[in-house]
Amino acid sequence: IVYDNSEVVNLSRMPIAQIKEKIMSDFTYAFNKLPDRSEISGRAAKPAALAFRGKLQLYWASWNKYGWPELSTFTPDPEEAKKAFSAAAEDFKHVIEDYGLNLFRNGEPGDWGTMGNAEVLPNYYYMFIPSTGNANDGGEMIFYFTHGGVGSAQGDPYMRDFGGRSQENSQCCLTPAMRLVNRYQSTKTGDFLPEVVGMNPSDPNARTAENSALNPESYANRDYRMKATMLWDYEMIMSLSSQKETGYVPFIFKNWGGKVEIDGKEYTTYRTDRSVDGYVFRKFIRNYGGAGRDEGDMNWPVIRLADVFLMYAEADNEVNGPQPYAIDLVNRVRHRGNLPPLTADKTAKFFLHKLIHPSF
């Protein structure tokens, strides 16, 4: 037990490799002791220990291959990198194959619905709200944090952070950036689309100009996960007040709480002044009543099967190059966004840029 900083301030730092091995041994111990499958929500099982051990090895391999600029005393070791990439891939493959896990709703994209309507949303949205996501269909959530919900004093605050005033007077503490929008690919070609252009809402052409960030048509035929994740101009979301549904509201950039008529019906627009680039989140915001902004019972994902698919592909690619097994895993993740599978000419480029694409 340490009682004062003076007891440790002059201790020399342990070598990073020694620290890494200690963490590895903890994950291995957990793997040996945990059950194959937990019967209690929020408790870890063997797949979680393997997934975290593999992730640590993937980091270690990457530092040893590509260096660690922030740590000038770290010396990369190519042989250590190759060994760690192989070990990471092995751990990830066991998670994928040995425990009967599957993607949420079998990785199917579901229906996109229609522009400016939220009655129907892609399957991806439903993985991140408690009423449907907490059931953990297929076991995709390998490790997650539970929350108590109403009356527990341990509810989740995610609606407060992600939602606006239209959802239980939430605070919209974070909003999507335009650079995220530009990562969502075309469902027709599988390629990136021309980057959207920010425009002032007062410009008379702002909502009709080609590739304008405020033109809803700029978002037609994009990765289904975009609609599941965010709102752009004229997209609808359920308004919530006093734990009750109060009807759909349209998001219109810089028109906060105004009156608009859409298809002959009057609406009050989404209320927030926090949006910077013209978007707000849909992901993690409940579309039903029953709980306040800090009273959610969301199972917050820490590591998911889709994450493991992509980490396996990265690790195996570093050792063996693009392989059919890894490409199939990547395409299973892409399918949930209704994206076409990778073709041979795009495979190498995909693996190079995987980490900056919201593929999972």
Give residue ranges: language-model regions:
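Acidic/polar-rich alpha-helix caps and helix-coil junctions
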Residues: 1-171, 190-360
